[in-house]
């Protein structure tokens, strides 16, 4: 990016920062005045139903095993087959199918393991009806989706402040999240785009909410209480999304995702329902995906 574009970018960052800052302040003050942030007492699922560290570690191990072992192994097998049979590299669409197989197997494996380990615990992690006036699963999902209007401006404001700091300290630097690059790669192939949308809009929110809120946050809550558990699980969630390819953008990404994850953790505790945090996560990813597909270049 040349020097002529620098003032324009600086102005855009300032304008966005002010806009999201005002929205975040006004909307969250209104929500606070209406009692939205009052949590009240919530049951310790991990303590009552025996959620242990070994189960949390196993669930994360299942996820990482598929991501770090299964995907590279299957990719190498397919590449070797094409090299031997056709003397060429496999079409890129094969790797989209690998992605679909992987995320599907991950969700199925997590469910089967958790259900076999303790079906009652799984039931209460997904939806705890022991809280006062529990709503329906659909109601929880919609509640979480609607809370996007509170969480998104805060995350966007923090991201813009971080971008401004990066601009002032290190100069102009553009970056893209790994998931954004993945989505843009699929735009020109309907099949690949459908697989990407399934991964980003359904598989990722369901899997990540189960792992970070349902498992990790529930276990941490037993050890340190609700608020520290939300903060710690949110920090783990943010760090989980870092990548060397994002450069200094990792700073902005980590801070904005941390604030967003705190909303996810709070919504999970407030509604005692994973459907609520999934609703918020799905909405966040859906709006972000819509913006990338229709309002960005490249």
Locate each region found by the language model.
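N-terminal, membrane-interfacial amphipathic/helix-forming hydrophobic leader that caps
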Residues: 1-145, 286-298
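Transmembrane helix-loop-helix hairpins at the membrane interface
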Residues: 2-28, 153-161, 173-298
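Generic intrinsically disordered, low-complexity segments enriched for polar/acidic and small residues
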Residues: 60-63, 92, 108-110, 121, ...
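C-terminal TM-helix exit segments that contain a strictly Trp-centered aromatic cap at the helix terminus
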Residues: 66-76, 154-166
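Hydrophobic alpha-helical transmembrane segments of integral membrane proteins
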Residues: 68-69, 149-150, 201-202
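Membrane interface segments of multi-pass transport proteins and intramembrane proteases
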Residues: 79-88, 127-131, 166-175, 220-227
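Short alpha-helical transmembrane interface motifs in multi-pass membrane proteins
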Residues: 90-94, 143, 147, 164, ...
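Interfacial segments of alpha-helical transmembrane regions
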Residues: 138-154, 217
């Amino acid at each position: 990016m040349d020097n002529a574009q620098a003032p324009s970018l600086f102005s855009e960052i300032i304008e966005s920062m002010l806009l999201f800052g005002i929205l975040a302040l006004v909307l969250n003050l209104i929500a606070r005045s209406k009692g939205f942030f009052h949590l009240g007492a919530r049951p310790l699922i991990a303590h009552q139903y025996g959620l242990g560290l070994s189960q949390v570690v196993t669930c994360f191990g299942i996820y990482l095993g598929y991501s770090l072992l299964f995907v590279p192994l299957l990719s190498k097998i397919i590449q070797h087959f094409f090299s031997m049979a056709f003397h060429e590299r496999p079409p890129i669409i094969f790797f989209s199918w690998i992605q679909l197989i992987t995320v599907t197997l991950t969700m199925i494996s997590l469910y089967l393991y958790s259900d076999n380990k303790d079906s009652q615990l799984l039931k209460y992690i997904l939806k705890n009806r022991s809280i006062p006036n529990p709503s329906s699963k659909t109601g929880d999902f919609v509640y979480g989706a609607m809370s996007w209007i509170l969480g998104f401006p805060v995350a966007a404001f923090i991201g813009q402040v971080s971008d401004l700091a990066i601009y002032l300290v290190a100069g102009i630097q553009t970056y893209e999240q790994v998931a954004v690059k993945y989505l843009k790669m699929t735009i020109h192939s309907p099949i690949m785009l459908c697989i990407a949308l399934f991964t980003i809009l359904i598989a990722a929110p369901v899997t990540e909410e189960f792992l970070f809120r349902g498992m990790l946050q529930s276990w941490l809550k037993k050890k340190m209480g609700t608020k520290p558990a939300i903060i710690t699980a949110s920090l783990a969630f943010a760090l989980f999304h870092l990548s060397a390819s994002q450069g200094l953008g990792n700073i902005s990404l980590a801070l904005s995702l941390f604030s967003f994850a705190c909303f996810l953790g709070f919504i999970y505790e407030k509604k005692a329902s994973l459907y609520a945090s999934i609703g918020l996560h799905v909405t966040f990813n859906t709006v972000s995906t819509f913006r990338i597909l229709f309002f960005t270049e490249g």
